[in-house]
C-alpha cells in the first residue's frame, strides 16, 4: 500500500476471516481437515509476520487476533519437542523438517519476559542439528525428500526436490535484531528441568483434542490427535493414521504382509491389510485418551480405543466389534537397526510374557494382558525412515463379535537391567459388560475407564 499498489480489501478481509476461523485454541489452527505442522510453519508463522510488517498498521483488529493466537504457542507447543529438542515425525510435508520450530523463534517478536527464550532457541538449534548431523540428510548436496534420508512413504504428490527448502523458514529468525531476547538468552531445557523421573506429564489442548505427553525417563515427547475423511486422502497415510507419534521412535510404514507399527490393521474383504484411517475423539478422562475408529472399507468393523500414558510406556484398553470374523493385527513402535542386529528376547514376569527388542539405543517391550492370540517379532526392509532394516513387535488375533484387547507397550534405554519396567500394572478389573475398567498400578495409583 505504501508503494501505491491496489489491494482488494473485501477479498483480503474474507481470507483473513477464513484463516482466523480455523483457530482451535492452545496455539493450534486446523489445516482442514487435519491437524499438522502447517498450524505452525504456515498459519502461525505467516500470521505473526504479516501482523508485524503489515497488519498492525493497516488492519490492527485482525493483527491483534493473530497475535493473541500466537501468544498461546509458548504454553503448549514447546512440550511437543523431546528433552534434547528433537521434533516428532508427524503430518504431511514432513520433509520441511526443522521449519516446524520457526514459530518458537519468532516468539522473539513478543519480547515477553515470561517466555523462556533459552528454551525456544534450544529447540530451534536442536532441530537444525537433528537433520544436519544425520548422515543421510543430503544427496547430491541437496536435502533428501524424506525425514532423515530419502523416504518415499512420507512424501506427497505435490512435493519435489525443491520442496525441502521450506525448512529454510526457520532462518526467518534472522529477522529478529541482534539485541532480541531470543538471541541473548542462554539455551536451556525449559520445563524438562522441572520434570521428575518415574512420572509422566500430559498437556491437553481441549478444543483441538490434541494430547502431548512428555516422558522424563527417556526424554521423549509424544502426540495423539484425531483424523477425519479428506478428499485429498491424506488421512489414509501413516503421516496421520498412527495411534500416536513419538520423538524417539519415528513412524514405520505399513507392509503388504501385515507389518504394522503403532497402529491396527485389519484384513479387509479384498484380502488386503487395511489400517485404521478415521479417528473420532470421545473424551480425555482420568488420564485415558479415548477415541473411536472404524474400517473405512467396512464401517461395521468398529474400534473403541483408550490409551493411558505411563512413565515408561502406554497401557491400551481397546474394544473391537465386527459382525463377521476378521483378522486383526496391532504393533508397538518399530526400532531401526543402528548398532548391528536387533536383539530379541521373551521375558516372563508375574505370569505374563513380554516380547522385547533392543537396538543398542532403546529397548521396546510389549505385553498382552487380554484378548490377543499371539505375538511375534516382525522384520521389515525399507519401511523405516532411519534404517533399511527394522523390527517391530506385532500382536494378532481373529475377532468376531465384541472383544477387548489390553496391551502394554513399554520402553527403556538400552543397557538397563531393570526388568520391572515391563510390568507397571498390579491388576486390571472389569465388569461383565466390559464397559468399566479399573487399573491398579504398582506405584499405587488407580485409574478408571468407562466406555
What are these regions (language model features)?
Residues 2-189:
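Extracellular polysaccharide-recognition and catalytic grooves
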Residues 19, 77, 104, 131, ...:
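Generic structural hydrophobic/aromatic packing signal, biased to beta-strands
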Residues 20-21, 57-74, 117-124, 170-195, ...:
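Contiguous hydrophobic segments
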Residues 25-59, 222-224, 233-294:
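A contiguous, well-structured "functional interface" segment within a domain
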Residues 28, 41, 50, 90, ...:
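A residue-identity detector for tryptophan
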Residues 107-114, 123-130, 134-274, 417-424, ...:
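Terminal, non-catalytic domain-edge segments
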Residues 252-254, 258-451:
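Extended repeat-based interaction scaffolds and adjacent low-complexity, acidic/S/T/P-biased segments
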Amino acid at each position: 500500500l505504501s508503494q501505491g499498489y491496489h489491494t482488494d480489501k473485501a477479498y483480503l478481509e474474507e481470507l483473513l476471516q477464513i484463516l482466523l476461523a480455523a483457530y482451535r485454541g492452545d496455539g493450534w489452527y486446523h489445516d482442514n481437515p487435519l491437524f499438522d505442522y502447517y498450524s505452525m510453519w504456515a498459519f502461525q508463522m505467516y500470521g505473526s509476520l504479516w501482523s508485524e510488517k503489515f497488519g498492525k498498521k493497516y488492519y490492527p483488529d485482525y493483527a491483534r487476533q493473530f497475535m493473541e493466537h500466537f501468544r498461546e504457542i509458548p504454553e503448549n507447543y514447546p512440550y511437543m519437542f523431546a528433552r534434547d529438542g528433537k521434533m516428532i515425525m508427524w503430518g504431511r510435508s514432513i520433509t520441511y523438517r526443522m521449519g516446524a520450530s520457526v514459530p518458537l523463534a519468532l516468539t522473539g517478536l513478543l519480547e515477553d519476559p515470561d517466555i523462556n527464550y533459552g528454551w525456544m532457541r534450544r529447540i530451534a538449534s536442536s532441530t537444525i542439528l537433528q537433520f544436519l548431523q544425520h548422515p543421510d540428510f543430503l544427496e547430491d548436496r541437496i536435502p533428501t525428500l524424506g525425514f532423515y534420508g530419502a523416504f518415499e512413504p512420507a512424501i506427497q504428490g505435490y512435493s519435489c526436490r525443491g520442496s525441502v527448502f521450506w525448512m529454510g523458514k526457520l532462518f526467518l529468525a534472522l529477522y529478529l535484531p541482534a539485541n532480541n531476547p531470543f538471541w541473548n538468552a542462554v539455551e536451556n531445557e525449559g520445563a524438562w528441568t522441572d520434570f521428575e523421573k518415574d512420572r509422566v506429564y500430559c498437556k491437553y489442548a481441549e478444543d483441538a483434542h490434541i494430547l502431548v505427553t512428555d516422558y522424563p525417563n527417556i526424554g521423549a515427547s509424544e502426540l495423539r490427535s484425531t483424523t477425519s475423511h479428506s478428499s485429498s486422502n491424506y488421512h489414509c497415510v501413516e503421516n496421520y493414521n498412527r495411534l500416536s507419534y513419538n520423538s524417539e521412535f519415528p513412524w514405520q510404514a505399513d507392509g503388504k504382509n501385515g507389518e504394522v507399527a503403532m497402529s491396527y490393521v485389519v484384513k479387509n474383504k479384498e484380502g488386503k491389510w487395511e489400517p485404521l484411517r478415521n479417528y473420532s475423539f470421545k473424551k480425555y478422562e482420568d488420564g485415558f485418551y479415548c477415541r473411536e475408529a472404524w474400517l473405512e472399507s467396512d464401517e461395521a468393523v468398529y474400534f473403541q480405543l483408550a490409551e493411558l500414558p505411563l512413565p515408561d510406556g502406554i497401557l491400551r484398553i481397546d474394544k473391537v466389534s465386527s459382525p463377521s470374523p476378521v483378522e486383526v493385527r496391532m504393533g508397538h513402535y518399530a526400532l531401526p537397526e543402528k548398532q548391528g542386529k536387533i536383539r530379541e528376547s521373551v521375558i516372563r514376569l508375574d505370569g505374563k510374557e513380554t516380547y522385547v527388542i533392543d537396538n543398542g539405543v532403546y529397548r521396546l517391550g510389549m505385553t498382552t494382558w487380554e484378548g490377543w492370540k499371539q505375538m511375534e517379532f516382525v522384520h521389515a526392509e525399507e519401511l523405516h525412515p532411519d534404517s533399511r532394516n527394522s523390527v517391530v513387535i506385532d500382536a494378532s488375533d481373529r475377532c468376531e463379535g465384541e472383544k477387548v484387547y489390553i496391551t502394554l507397550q513399554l520402553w527403556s534405554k538400552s543397557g538397563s537391567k531393570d526388568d520391572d519396567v515391563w510390568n507397571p500394572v498390579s491388576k486390571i478389573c472389569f465388569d461383565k459388560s466390559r464397559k468399566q475398567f479399573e487399573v491398579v498400578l504398582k506405584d499405587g495409583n488407580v485409574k478408571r475407564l468407562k466406555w
